[in-house]
Amino acid sequence: MELKLLNENGQEGAVVNASDVVFGRDYNEALIHQVVIAYQANARQGNRAQKDREQVKHTTKKPWRQKGTGRARAGMSSSPLWRGGGRIFPNSPEENFSHKVNKKMHRAGLCSIFSQLAREGRLSVVEDIILEAPKTKLLADKFKTMGLDSVLIITDTVDENLYLASRNLPHVAIVEPRYADPLSLIYFKKVLVTKAAVAQIEELLS
């Protein structure tokens, strides 16, 4: 598979030969969907909570007598039928949202995403991205020259200047190959991969 190599002006020049095993896979929508859903589910904190009728702080006094009033019988104001009462099936922090995806499936899903990005022209290779100083303006000007506004940068090692300069830019993220997740790969409009990172990705996913 040939990947486009961009220069500092965002123009396509030479090409980089990449592994077909990683960047030449067929598009598998069902597998990608499963991998993304599992990633989102496993990222949930699971801290939502509601109260049932036992946990709601209400008096247990019977609101009115059982018979003779003409009203519906009622036992206590914490009943789920009442406003301010407890929930019948409340959400609990103990709920388990985790989804298990085998390593082989996870790798295949990432390969399918990388391959589709390459086919759509959303994945490009750069020699390296180096900044002389940790200045956001320097990086913003570089992206403007290259015509980028939403970009995920995958680099073999995260340069400190590059990391500090990118923190205040919206829709920009920098990760190492081992931390590239399926959701970010799909979310960003453009994915830039350094030459050294391409080799690392092939080693991780082959």
From Swiss-Prot:
Entries under Gene3D superfamilies matching the protein: 3.40.1370.10
What's an example GO BP annotation here? translation
Highest rank taxon of the organism: Bacteria
Instruction: List keywords of the entry alphabetically.
Output: Ribonucleoprotein, Ribosomal protein, RNA-binding, rRNA-binding
Question: Is-annotated flag, keyword RNA-binding?
Answer: yes
InterPro entries per UniProt: Ribosomal_uL4, Ribosomal_uL4-like, Ribosomal_uL4_dom_sf
Q: Where is this region: Disordered?
A: 46-78
Q: Which GO terms describe its molecular function?
A: rRNA binding; structural constituent of ribosome
Q: Where is the composition biased (Basic residues)?
A: 58-70
Please give the Pfam families that the UniProt record associates with this protein. Ribosomal_L4
GO CC term, one of those recorded: ribonucleoprotein complex
What biological function has been recorded for the protein in this entry? One of the primary rRNA binding proteins, this protein initially binds near the 5'-end of the 23S rRNA. It is important during the early stages of 50S assembly. It makes multiple contacts with different domains of the 23S rRNA in the assembled 50S subunit and ribosome. Forms part of the polypeptide exit tunnel.
Which HAMAP family does the protein's record reference? Ribosomal_uL4_B
PANTHER family reported for this sequence: 50S RIBOSOMAL PROTEIN L4, LARGE RIBOSOMAL SUBUNIT PROTEIN UL4M
Instruction: Provide the family line.
Output: Belongs to the universal ribosomal protein uL4 family.
Note the subunit structure: Part of the 50S ribosomal subunit.
Q: What is this protein called?
A: Large ribosomal subunit protein uL4
Taxonomic path: Bacteria, Pseudomonadati, Pseudomonadota, Betaproteobacteria, Burkholderiales
